[in-house]
């Protein structure tokens, strides 16, 4: 789903047929692409399934989904936090992971977030400004925001959503695709590790809060012309694939999520989607039947503002930036020069020893990737002629100039042909200047769910 200008004729909605990607096709789609994923444990599973699918056509195991903060997962590397720091369930928990393929043509990085906007997010944006520019950013933060930051959490969430979209609009280059994942539906009983025992009474209203938070985040993302993938809609009937904790999902759900995400990305980049002759998937077929019955009872997309009695968004003014008590030093120069176009991410230098500290001088944009999978990708489509923005890597995309294939969802708005955002180029990106006192290791406690 995307938001764009008014008075644009809607494209024909496709049926609920699902596109399935093989590993070789994912390798081609993300060839020479830098993918950044930010969010909670759900987004960590999104990262893990994408890393796995970049290497082989298998599903995650239950133990891989359950593991958190491990030193290595499927040839990736834990860069910071997790087992390198202290395992706890506090809002200062950090975990940074990175996967670089053996060929050096795929780079995927994950940052664990406990709040959609914070000083830590500004640190992340500053780190990204020193390395290659991301080609794809996938982000969500909702459950922690609505359950761990006081009684006015929804108001704070809205303010922080506006902050993060403004900053992403300023920092990311024009060529970067940002996809905001809406939070997935919760179960009636929520026992995820992010919800402390003393906060269990909040679980009663958290399901409704997530729907309301999704409404605000989709609206604000649309205001900034960012793409939105409505996972709440797509997984509303997948109850049996949700874990007993009411929050997390099994490996089949996450592979389905990966296919939805990759289809959205391929369509946004104008890539011809693969066509496979395959037997129907009973799991997907069950969803299709429920989707049709849902659509039959709503000739038009439902008005969720009326159903949820949500107020219209008033004119919103960005709160003043956070202030800090001492003067700031100028930002240090990057440790590595920008990558030339079509250069693999792997440069052969060893990964520097990394102690988990907030230090702008420490950069892990281009680590040695270690042993990788020596797979041979399929034939690549011809590269596309035209300018490539600074720091970007030309991949094997096929621009067809065809209408977007948008799946049915309550927020459908068609995408116009050209870009609707006008952001600063990579070389002119704004770097956050106010800094908070750098913390060392995160506080001790229990492991997050």
Swiss-Prot record:
The gene is Pced1a. It comes from the Eukaryota. It comes from Mus musculus. This is PC-esterase domain-containing protein 1A. Belongs to the PC-esterase family.
